[in-house]
């Protein structure tokens, strides 16, 4: 529900939040009533972040415990945490070894009222991760590579389970990034097993120590613990990826699975002008009314650090901040035709960016906070400057958007921005400067 109406200033966040409340006041009042009226219904306040990122950072337990009855005798039960959500990227939590996926509103409401969710037992694809990640390679590069491979394989309606020695190289935020994009690679979910990284994340995110010990003990007793010694699990089929082969990448201009190696993006865009956008000429330099600059095919009109996919990952967010710091100290500035925005999936992101001293450099480049929630990747990028959109429309310019989101389908990001590329947050900053 967050729209990037205002951007590029310190007041943008407050202005967008005020508009969000104005547009959604009836919804929020209804949810508040629900929280007061039902014992088993809790509401995370508006402006807190994206539901599945909040679930990863605060709520999920991996192994759940509660009181129950066996043969009319009250006992304490332990069982794996599971979740269904009305956002397709609910799958993100599989990175923390919690089985979950997106469902429709009616299914979710039925589950809230105690009804079971039925499903056909799915095929399971085993995806082996091996090798080590090279320096400079991000979780975004990795997930775009995995998305490309799994789309080619065909995993619609199937579970994907990741295994192998290479998992030791992946933090929980890295795994969550991969699990998040399950809808884009077509799977019902992309699941990671419980291991020491799981325990480490539960500890650093402030989970209850007793609950953490339960996770470890339960997983080992039930055979759910990943020790990397051998994998005798039976899968429908298997795939493999060597982390050392991953290259810096983007995906676009219209689909998340269309990965392009960074060094070839310019050449591929020029090809797409003719093949995808039916342009006869590779250049159409056009003056922007009322401004002292011109725009052409390929100019980046939107640069958005956005969505749960990447803002949940501190390594790429800090990377974006460090790049902004270096650029600001060199006196570099964002191009005047670029609409910049920072919309994290939770308040934790701005907390560590501010405490580390990096937020001020992002601000200098125009990446001010615009809100906490889904924005550009669901089409809530907000309007471009009128003179810029008029120039694009009048001259049929194929301009670009670069976003750290998970979807870039044509017409989704902005009606005037036809070529959209998924990229890591550091690359979003770089393209805003280019």
Each predicted region: which residue ranges?
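Fe-S-dependent hydro-lyases/dehydratases of central metabolism
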Residues: 1-434
């Amino acid at each position: 529900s967050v729209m990037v109406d205002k951007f590029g200033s310190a007041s943008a966040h407050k202005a967008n939040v005020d508009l969000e409340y104005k547009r959604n006041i009836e919804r929020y009042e209804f949810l508040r009533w629900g929280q007061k009226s039902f014992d088993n219904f809790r509401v995370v306040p508006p402006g807190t972040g994206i539901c599945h990122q909040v679930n990863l950072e605060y709520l999920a337990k991996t192994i759940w415990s509660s009181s129950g009855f066996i043969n009319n005798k009250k006992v304490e039960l332990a069982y794996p945490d599971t979740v269904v959500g009305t956002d397709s990227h609910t799958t993100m939590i599989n990175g923390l070894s919690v089985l979950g996926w997106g469902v429709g509103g009616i299914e979710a409401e039925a589950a809230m009222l105690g009804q079971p969710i039925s499903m056909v037992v799915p095929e399971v694809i085993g995806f082996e991760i091996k090798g080590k990640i090279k320096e400079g390679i991000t979780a975004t590069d990795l997930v775009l590579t995995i998305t490309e491979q799994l789309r080619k394989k065909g995993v619609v309606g199937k579970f994907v389970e990741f295994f192998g020695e290479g998992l030791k190289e992946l933090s929980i935020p890295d795994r969550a990034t991969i699990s998040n994009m399950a809808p884009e690679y077509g799977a019902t979910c992309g699941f990671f097993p419980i291991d020491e990284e799981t325990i480490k994340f539960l500890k650093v995110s402030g989970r209850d120590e007793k609950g953490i010990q339960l996770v470890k003990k339960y997983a080992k007793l039930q055979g759910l613990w990943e020790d990397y010694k051998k994998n005798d699990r039976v899968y429908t089929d298997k795939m493999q990826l060597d982390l050392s082969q991953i290259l810096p990448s983007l995906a676009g201009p219209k689909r998340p699975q269309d990965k392009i190696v960074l060094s070839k993006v310019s050449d591929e865009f020029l090809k797409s002008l003719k093949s995808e956008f039916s342009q006869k000429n590779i250049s159409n330099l056009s003056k922007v009314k009322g401004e002292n600059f011109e725009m052409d095919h390929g100019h980046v009109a939107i640069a958005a650090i956005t969505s749960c996919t990447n803002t949940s990952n501190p390594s790429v967010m800090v990377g974006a901040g460090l790049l902004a710091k270096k650029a600001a100290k060199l006196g570099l500035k964002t191009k005047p035709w670029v609409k910049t925005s920072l919309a994290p999936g939770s308040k934790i992101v701005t907390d560590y960016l501010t405490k580390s001293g990096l937020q001020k450099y992002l601000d200098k480049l125009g990446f001010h906070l615009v809100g906490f929630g889904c924005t550009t990747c669901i089409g809530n990028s907000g309007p471009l400057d009128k003179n810029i959109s008029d120039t694009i429309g009048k001259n049929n310019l194929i301009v670009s958007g670069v976003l750290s989101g998970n979807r870039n389908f044509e017409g989704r990001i902005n009606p005037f921005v036809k070529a959209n590329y998924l990229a890591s947050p550091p690359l979003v900053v770089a393209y805003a400067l280019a």
